[in-house]
């Protein structure tokens, strides 16, 4: 049986997304084994961001500076905005290094069941950014859920009054995916979005 402090650390780690009690205990044991190198580095990293984390006023990204590094980067294409549901989606897309524009984080998705309305999301700020001008394209990169598609449709309707191209991510078969393992919705979307062989 571990000490109360070690149990407290495991309990705290278990509250992180993706970590259950067993994974948290394994992480604690690893930290104990590597306490001379890993633990000080982890503490330093946590202390380094604890008081410096801010939400970007422009896009809603989380960073240690405001505006965030993406919004402040002069090499980014300022004429295109990719709209995502949350910061995790922004980070995933940016890791792929395929989109060179800037982002906009909604902070969620419309959901009648959860009582999330348009005014609960960061939509007004998006419309303000587009209204300022200089934006040629808005990419709607919502998840392929009913709520995500409802959110995309709502935003597309709100953007119709502006002279911008509105696009959305393609949905369908994942690379390496086998047809037998895919759900009917994914297969239907893949069939609807089929294109000529090149």
UniProtKB/Swiss-Prot annotation:
Keywords noted in UniProt: DNA damage, DNA recombination, DNA repair, Metal-binding, Zinc, Zinc-finger
**One Pfam entry name:** RecR_HhH
The Toprim domain extends over 79-174
Q: Which GO-annotated molecular functions does the record name? A: DNA binding; zinc ion binding
Instruction: Give the boundaries of each C4-type zinc finger.
Output: 56-71
GO BP terms: namely: DNA recombination; DNA repair
Give the family from UniProt.
Belongs to the RecR family.
Per its UniProt record, what NCBIfam families does this chain match? recR
Instruction: Summarize the protein's role.
Output: May play a role in DNA repair. It seems to be involved in an RecBC-independent recombinational process of DNA repair. It may act with RecF and RecO.
Q: What is this protein called?
A: Recombination protein RecR
Please name the taxonomic classification of the source.
Bacteria, Pseudomonadati, Pseudomonadota, Alphaproteobacteria, Sphingomonadales
Protein encoded by which gene: recR
């Amino acid at each position: 049986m571990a000490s109360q402090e070690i149990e407290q650390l495991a309990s705290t780690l278990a509250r992180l997304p993706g970590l259950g009690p067993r994974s948290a205990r394994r992480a604690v044991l690893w930290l104990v084994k590597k306490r001379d190198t890993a633990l000080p580095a982890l503490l330093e990293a946590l202390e380094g961001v604890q008081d410096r984390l801010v939400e970007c006023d422009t896009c809603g990204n989380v960073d240690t500076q405001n505006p965030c590094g993406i919004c402040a980067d002069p090499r980014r294409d300022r004429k295109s905005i990719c709209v995502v549901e949350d910061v995790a989606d922004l980070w995933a897309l940016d890791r792929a290094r395929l989109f060179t524009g800037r982002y906009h984080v909604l902070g969620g998705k419309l959901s009648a069941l959860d009582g999330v309305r348009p005014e609960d999301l960061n939509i007004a700020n998006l419309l303000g950014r587009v209204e300022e001008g200089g934006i040629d394209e808005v990419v709607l990169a919502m998840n392929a859920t009913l709520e995500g598609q409802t959110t995309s449709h709502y935003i597309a309707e709100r953007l119709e009054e502006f002279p911008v191209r509105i696009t959305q991510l393609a949905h369908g078969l994942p690379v390496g995916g086998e047809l037998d393992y895919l759900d009917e919705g994914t297969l239907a979307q893949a069939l609807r979005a089929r294109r000529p062989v090149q």
